[in-house]
Design a protein with these regions (language model features):
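Short helix-loop boundary/capping segments
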Residues: 77-82
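Short, flexible helical or helix-coil boundary motifs
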Residues: 39-42, 138, 142
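Histidine-centered, metal-coordinating catalytic motifs and their short helical/loop contexts
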Residues: 70, 86-140
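Long, compositionally biased intrinsically disordered regions
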Residues: 144-150
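Helix-loop junctions and short alpha-helical segments
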Residues: 1-60, 88-92
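Short, hydrophobic, well-ordered secondary-structure elements
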Residues: 52-76
Length: 150
């Protein structure tokens, strides 16, 4: 995946917490990947600040990765397609994170009645790429909307 070739972790002190941002999923030359812009965006957007705080804990568990997904989905008015997230990807992610038949004891729910969701569940690597790509595109979207220019 070309977007995963360049991956960096940035830490920046903001207020009383540290924000760790996985930056440069596209290119270091992309002005929308500028760390200062991301930090400034977090200072004016509570949703961005919360996602950054959650990313500090990692996304290697279904509960935290789902929190990140929920915040972005809500912020985008449940229209993740404009971030390049397909309905199929969203369904695969939510089914994997939620259903114990797909993710075992680590799922968000202890029991879900009915049929097991059809289709291939996301692997942990798939989920990591899905979440970080979505975060990156969401930040780019917000910066492209000129939020910091106001």
């Amino acid at each position: 995946d070309d977007e995963m070739k360049v991956v960096k972790h940035h830490a920046y002190a903001v207020s009383d917490f540290t924000v760790q941002v996985r930056d440069a999923l596209n290119s270091e030359d992309n002005v929308l990947n500028d760390l200062e812009k991301w930090v400034n965006l977090a200072s004016v957007s509570g949703a961005v600040a919360k996602v950054f705080r959650l990313l500090r804990f990692g996304i290697d568990d279904y509960v935290n990765s789902y929190r990140v997904y929920e915040i972005i989905n809500h912020d985008m008015g449940k229209n993740l397609r404009c971030l390049g997230v397909t309905d199929r990807e969203s369904r695969r992610f939510t089914a994997t994170a939620n259903h114990p038949a797909l993710s075992g004891d680590e799922s968000r729910h202890g029991f879900i009645g009915g049929d097991t969701p059809k289709g291939e569940p996301m692997s942990p690597g798939d989920i990591e790429r899905f979440i970080y790509r979505m975060v990156n595109r969401w930040i780019h979207h917000k910066l492209s909307m000129g939020i910091l220019d106001e």
